[in-house]
Amino acid sequence: MKTLKLQYHKHDIKIGKRCDFVPPTVTESCLLEYDGEVIGFYLTDLPDKLKQYITIANKEFLSKNVPKSLLERSDVYEMQRKLGISRKEAMARNTVQMSTILGAVLAKPHLRRPYNSVSAVHTNEKAKTFIKAMLLSCLECEKLIEKYMPQQYKLQKKLIEETTLPKYRFGNLFTSSISNFNIAAPFHQDRGNLKHTVNAILTKRKDTEGGALCVPDFQHTFEQANNSLLVYPAWFNIHGVTKIIKHNEDGYRNSLIFYPLAGFDK
């Protein structure tokens, strides 16, 4: 597999800015090297076993079996205000966005939950197939990380063992998972993650374009094709998801993400 040597570029993009549609610059499988180190990789095609697992996970995620949180973007509210239409009408004219979290969830005192916990989805019997498929997908991703980034695998496994109680682990390298339906996240940095770790981002999509990961520091946008995997150090710098364009009503772009949060040592 070829190696893409990344270089830092100055820019004026700030956290919170929405990411416009940008054609992808990285469309082939490659290792990502920065400052002499492999910091991630992109695979445009996956091993059959992993493909099978994420197909099952995606099917379940799209079904009513899996509880989801509905996210309402600012443009829904803006459309309501400008056109004087109902929330339902505004949502119908925009792309519905939903997400589901598995694994560990950090304490949220402002929501009267001053303690760490495990996602309530794990108690939902109808979601069991989804949870199993996601965990198996996670373990297969870890095998690929061990294959392409053996030093990172050892480091991250050790970090999780040293900082995360067993009940808060998702696989061996992560604490949590989030599945996103049509979410084009604005520029952000995963500051809550353990430092010196990587996220694993699987993509399932149908009849859409956009929804690529844009990293302004490196002036690159990763395609995130159907059945692809992007392994990236999300704690390291800002990144955002480009605008998702649906070609028909059934179109979607789903990301199935595994990530390692800090703060689960008690």
Language-model-detected regions and their locations in the chain:
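Fe(II)/2-oxoglutarate oxygenase catalytic core
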Residues: 1-200, 205, 221-222, 242-266
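Coil-to-beta-strand transition motifs
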Residues: 197, 206-210, 236
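Structural signal for hydrophobic/aromatic residues that build the beta-strand cores
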Residues: 202, 213, 227-230, 256
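A short beta-strand-loop-beta hairpin characteristic of the jelly-roll/cupin
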Residues: 204-225
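A generic "cationic amphipathic patch" detector
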Residues: 215, 240-243
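Conserved metal-binding segment of the jelly-roll/cupin
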Residues: 222-238
